[in-house]
Amino acid sequence: MKRTFQPSVLKRNRTHGFRARMANKNGRQVLARRRAKGRARLTVAG
């Protein structure tokens, strides 16, 4: 059986990247929560 995690930087960024987060309201809420919490990295890309 193949492993489920087959890394791809392109897929990672398209799903979890900064621009993907900014593209809709809920994603912006994610960023706002992470800023409020004081995260050093808001997204996998940043």
Curated annotation (Swiss-Prot):
State any single GO MF term: structural constituent of ribosome
Q: Which GO terms are recorded in the biological process aspect for this UniProt protein?
A: translation
PROSITE patterns in the cross-refs: RIBOSOMAL_L34
Alphabetic keyword roster: Ribonucleoprotein, Ribosomal protein
Q: Extract the Gene3D superfamilies matched here.
A: 1.10.287.3980
Is Ribonucleoprotein among this UniProt entry's keywords?
yes
Q: Which GO terms describe its cellular component?
A: ribonucleoprotein complex; ribosome
Q: Which InterPro entries match?
A: Ribosomal_bL34, Ribosomal_bL34_CS
NCBIfam families attached to this UniProt entry:
rpmH_bact
Q: PANTHER family under this entry?
A: LARGE RIBOSOMAL SUBUNIT PROTEIN BL34M (PTHR14503:SF4), MITOCHONDRIAL RIBOSOMAL PROTEIN 34 FAMILY MEMBER (PTHR14503)
Q: Write out the similarity annotation.
A: Belongs to the bacterial ribosomal protein bL34 family.
The protein, known as: Large ribosomal subunit protein bL34
From which source organism is this entry?
A: Edwardsiella ictaluri (strain 93-146)
Q: Which gene encodes it?
A: rpmH
